Amino acid sequence: MNSQDLKKRQEKIRNFSIIAHIDHGKSTLADRILEKTETVSSREMQAQLLDSMDLERERGITIKLNAIELNYTAKDGETYIFHLIDTPGHVDFTYEVSRSLAACEGAILVVDAAQGIEAQTLANVYLALDNDLEILPVINKIDLPAADPERVRHEVEDVIGLDASEAVLASAKAGIGIEEILEQIVEKVPAPTGDVDAPLQALIFDSVYDAYRGVILQVRIVNGIVKPGDKIQMMSNGKTFDVTEVGIFTPKAVGRDFLATGDVGYVAASIKTVADTRVGDTVTLANNPAKEALHGYKQMNPMVFAGIYPIESNKYNDLREALEKLQLNDASLQFEPETSQALGFGFRCGFLGLLHMDVIQERLEREFNIDLIMTAPSVVYHVHTTDEDMIEVSNPSEFPDPTRVAFIEEPYVKAQIMVPQEFVGAVMELSQRKRGDFVTMDYIDDNRVNVIYQIPLAEIVFDFFDKLKSSTRGYASFDYDMSEYRRSQLVKMDILLNGDKVDALSFIVHKEFAYERGKIIVEKLKKIIPRQQFEVPIQAAIGQKIVARSDIKALRKNVLAKCYGGDVSRKRKLLEKQKAGKKRMKAIGSVEVPQEAFLSVLSMDDDAKK
């Protein structure tokens, strides 16, 4: 194709993604679009086709973004090339969403006709507006008995401020309105800008590792053209590679002769080292490089940290390799090696949130077959010392000595909770119990309220989401973003077994709850840790001060069994001898801590705060 033909082809390209709150029908709509454009034969069709991970199907959520090419013949008789980039809806995967939106010119905003706008719908719309995308509102599930499309249309206009007069009324499940959506994409989503004759600039928005072909890059071509045989260069580190194959996904990978401006596809170039390619980097040609890199993505900072340790210590290197491969297509995962006296060698990992942590743990166990122990999650604290230094601490065992601490600041988040009016009381009570500060609340419509609180991230990390869902019968939707660091009365609590600290059981807690929290854990551990031949004291301590204690009684042999009568001094002698033996044993004995003990600290019940 000459550059004239390529420019004509470029005018027919439409890049768009679908954004929605969880369960508003995003993956179903994607399935219908694939069927309508006959990209996938009815034989290959299955529900949630783009959610290729088993985990995504089981939980019914989208975790990874996916990009596929479709051909659509519009009513004007022209054939258009669509690139549909599927995005996750959950708050923990906002980073995935921002990456996929950067590769698009338009976004379909799916809103449930019964539930209306939810917290994450808003969060994703603001991301789309930041990227200057054309937004097409679609009101989905109009065939539900509880659907109220007119109310939702007003919500879209009032809450988001979009013109919803031309919003498509659709039902992805029943296949209603799909053609209208496709026609609107043709009319309203702009064709990609960019110059085919300019030096190559391609944005890497994802990558996967293939055991045979090395790292495969998923790219959006912004300027220029790339074909097999070209020598490409990464603009961040200058490394060069020879392109072996380029192509598109339909969802299967299909090889092509070239990828030109506006295309979304993959590039394979025998890249063997995972670290050489970074999501957000720009690819250019080595012999005709672009002057500057594309504006990439802002790096996401992890909010939640936890230690991950292999149960079998010889799996340490396998765990490192597994984490490196996961990091390849999940750029927000961070990890560094750490050691623990109780758990041996492992990694300190940073995650965007609890669901992210959960998904990574499951992927490690399923895809790489590694059994893990996770320590309790913690957040990043700013510890100000008496010599006027500020240390960032994400691991309780790194906390400085209490005598050196001047004050501690912890991260607060701005939590936006959308909830039916009848549950406002329950939400406020829960937020208050989690040390939240009320900011404001406003009514979205007659029945739904948007409540905003400032809540410490450490409280959200544990079980805020579960508690919120159970106290509102699942009706509340929740979104949060980082707000600020504030001074708090925090202390580090150590757990001592037989007088020895167990580093993996330490945690940070607010002074007010320290006594109750310590008591609960000590009692829990008493039930879990097996009895020994000697008495084992379990203590919870803040610095040198013991705040709670419980003893595991020793297993005793009845040494008097063979004394059928006889002198009391003989019995006393035997008992004294046993006592001395136990004392010696206690001095040299060590206590085995079962895995459930670490998990019990993780699943801290809220009993302390009731």
Swiss-Prot record:
Keywords: Cell membrane, GTP-binding, Hydrolase, Membrane, Nucleotide-binding, Protein biosynthesis. Its main location: membrane. It catalyses: GTP + H2O = GDP + phosphate + H(+). Required for accurate and efficient protein synthesis under certain stress conditions. May act as a fidelity factor of the translation reaction, by catalyzing a one-codon backward translocation of tRNAs on improperly translocated ribosomes. Back-translocation proceeds from a post-translocation (POST) complex to a pre-translocation (PRE) complex, thus giving elongation factor G a second chance to translocate the tRNAs correctly. Binds to ribosomes in a GTP-dependent manner. GO terms for cellular component: plasma membrane. SMART domains: EFG_C (SM00838). Gene3D superfamilies: 3.30.70.240, Elongation factor 4, C-terminal domain, Elongation Factor G (Translational Gtpase), domain 3, P-loop containing nucleotide triphosphate hydrolases, Translation factors. Its EC number is 3.6.5.n1. It comes from Streptococcus pyogenes serotype M12 (strain MGAS9429). GO terms for biological process: positive regulation of translation. This is Elongation factor 4. The gene is lepA. It is found in: Cell membrane. Transmembrane segments: none annotated.
